[in-house]
Amino acid sequence: MSASRRESEPKEAETSPEAGGAASDRRRSKTSRACDQCREKKTRCDFSDERPICSACQRMGKTCTFERVPMKRGPTKGYTRNSEPPEGFDTSRRGSRKRSSSDVFKGDAGRPRADPVSLPPLAQYLPQSGSQPRLQPLLAPGAQPQQQFWKVPYYEYQHQRRGSIDSLGSDVSNRNGSEQLAYLPSNASSGSQFYPASQAQYASQLPSDVEGANPEDCRGSLSLPAIQKFQQPPSGYYLQYPYSQFSMLPQQQQQQQQQNAQQSYFTSQYVPPAAPPGAEHFKEFDEGFHSRKGSDVSVAVSPSSPVQVTRTQQAGLNSESRDTNTATAVSPKPLPKPSKPQMQTERSSSKSDGNHNGPRKQKRKNSNRNKPGSQSSIESIASSSHASIIYGKIPDKQLIDIYFEFIHPNFPVIPINKETLTDDLLLVNTQPISPVHELNTYILHWFRNSLELLVRVALKKPSGSGQAYSDGAVDILDSQATFINALNECFQRIVDIHPGLRENEKLLSLKTKFIYLATFSILNYILAFVGYDNSFVLGMSVTIYNECKLYRYLMYDELPSNDTEASENEDEAGAGDAHASGTPERGKSAKHDLGHQVLFKRLYVLLVVFDSLQSCAFGVPKLISVPLAELTEETFKFSTGKWCVERDPQRFETIRQSLVLGQVLSWLSISRKSVRRNSLQAAPQDASWKDEKSDSVSSSLFAKFLVQKHEMMEDFLLLAPLENSSHLLTFDLLSKSSTAICGLISSMHRLLALLMKINPTNSVDPNNRPPLRQGDFVHTDTEIQSESSNPPAATAAPDSCDADKFDVYRKLLGLNGGQERHVAQGTISPFVISIVVEIRNVLELVKHLPTSIIGVVVNLLPNGEGENYQKRSHRLVMSLSNAMNELVQITSLISLLKPFKMFDHTLRSNRPSAKVSTKLLRQKFAPESVKTPSSQPPSSSPGPNSDGSNNTSLSQNTVMHAILDAAWDLMDGEELGWL
């Protein structure tokens, strides 16, 4: 070490004349590197060649060791770019600095920096000792095993010559060091107890050197995950990773791989758990990768590094004056950015241990005293200094399987089938040899985090929303404030990447663009699923979609319907030549480009549906004016080709009905009276909700309910001129009004009964799984539970006290053990919150109308003439009596349904603002004759027939006012929102 120092000092004097002639004669007063003991105690180390043991170690009776990984050193004092030494001199000098007298680092100085190292595969699939026995998946005839869907690096680049398949292993192992840089594994989680799988932990050694990217080569790139340098693995090491870039090995090597490596998960979509998880999913997970929210460094550097939630977010949790039902008190702005002075204040407040800690802890204890145990435990965990938003709790493959089993069959937020998504779209280039690998990795990272956020929020809690698990563990996302912070973080990170995406738009593949835009679709789905009003997310999503020119794809031709299997094979073969490139492959066929265009059109359709839902639910103006009737029919066609949404025809019908509901919502939001003053008489163009088969789908029943409610409102508003007149209600008018009310109540009852049968909590429940469909394959060693042994959620109440209530509705809902299960059993929907809230609002408006109308009809019976009138009156009274019976059942069903996650919604009739808005609407839209009441009330006019005619007119007048009040309230809901 001294010899190399004496050689480098004269060269430094020659190379850096600014340092002066005395630089060569100056001796260093301290060692170049402190020993481990001095570094730990942060004391001065006087270790040298002449003194093998420093003073501190000599006093403690220890020896100087240098086993810690050396940190990167900065430039020398007086360094300038003009005085930068040549590359060879800098390398030798850097090697001399890292030199020490320890035997551990004897070979470091002579080791070149460009040593060939190997690109590590996905480390979470490394088998562990003592794991579950290997399970061979049962695949469909001719199907290919699925590869790992995130960050699967390719083995080639567009400027490199593609080697043969037989020499693939040697080609990868013989690459130079610059091509063998890779990222740390992004998923360090163990197996989820939601599914019987064993995911292994990354057990290899940590990298000994961290190399940063060249600042001159990435000026326009983002500060994304740090590149890690790994050691060369032994030969055959890659055979343990079935989802790495080596999955393209020959068939013989793949068979050997299956014999030596343990398969960590089934490839099927429907796999019943080996043991009922009950309340134990997410019980014990290995530490996942943490969120980097509020970090001053790279937004995605080393995803496995922990980070704490900032105290500015915790303040809303610990405040006693915070309203738990309003999100504005928790997060007034959707995207807060902590500033450096705030961070310094937080550090200083965390360091103070004096008089502040005692009162603060006492206040927190008192504030949680009157709260339920589960809620206080959630807030205590969320507000603790060690709380953090940890992603990676669900393994990647299980995350995709949960989505396609519980979420996709009801509403395809990712509008593509499972095989195409996992085997094609998610296989993008993340190797550092690509100029856009950082962008690809960043987009995949937050796409995965957004999907996990959706799944974790949708998972059913054992004792209802916001309850603690049996082992005391609580998911931090059950906290309202933490959920809002997690949602805002995912949205902010994906928006921040948009300038870089526009800058590299010509270099990005269509796959990456689809994944990026699908992330916005997932975030808008989460907002609709929990019923949270955040118009900023939807507005920015529309802006991003317009920036990407997605509306231009609407004029392109659609993919041919006769999508044959042979043409797909030709398409895949043609795309295989440029399969790994991060740039758009110009050699693709026109049909392959049309396939991606179909995906972009579907994403645009889904965004229009979310826009329409938010417009109707919260009463905001519609942002996209594109009609959906013809666009949905063209874009979402049933097929079994590569670019289809769903290959099962029954599941596709459920998806289609959800899109039809989007058409009705779009029509209602565009046809508001506040926008168009004239009365709307036309019905939506697509009348598919009148189909008998559509009554078995909740979205179709909700669309039918909305149309019936709108038509009834229009009919009732036509009676507004008669409100203050002397005309009495006729029997025909009463019969028409009664028919509309009874039909609306019947639709409400059928819709709630169907929700109760399918999924009363609108949650992902392992005990209430969708039925096994055609094309789903399970493992031969796994015993599938019978349908009778896997009851729907309606028979498995979350609380024991509600068990009797659920048993009452077994016969009502037809939940017999041998009955065929519903095709949408166990699936979740983004419309359930809006359905339940709007039915509760309408119930408050119409629940007294049947009784009032029956009273009027009974009073009119003595005055009726003819036997026909008597029969019609009896039938009318009978239908109104049945409606009253259904109202009682509707009230019970609403009390049993628990779709609310973390936000509660107050009835519109109980809001003070609703009464004011209804009064203003009546003043604006009511006829002039109604605004000016008549001088002589109709109730005081003498009756021509008998003494009881005055009482009859009074009852009719009361019914008239009740009907018109309900009509104005219904109009207020349509104009200003349901929630």
UniProtKB/Swiss-Prot annotation:
Compositionally biased tracts (Low complexity): 132-142, 251-263, 296-309, 369-380, 942-953
Keywords, sorted A to Z: Activator, Cytoplasm, DNA-binding, Metal-binding, Nucleus, Repressor, Transcription, Transcription regulation, Zinc
Gene3D superfamilies documented for this protein: Zn(2)-C6 fungal-type DNA-binding domain
One Pfam family of this chain: Zn_clus
DNA-binding region, residue range(s): 35-64
InterPro entries: Carb_Metab_Trans_Reg, Zn2-C6_fun-type_DNA-bd_sf, Zn2Cys6_DnaBD
GO cellular component assignments: cytoplasm; nucleus
Bias-annotated ranges (Basic and acidic residues): 1-14, 36-47, 105-114, 280-295
Identification of the protein by name: Glucose transport transcription regulator RGT1
Native source species: Lachancea thermotolerans (strain ATCC 56472 / CBS 6340 / NRRL Y-8284)
Gene it is expressed from: RGT1
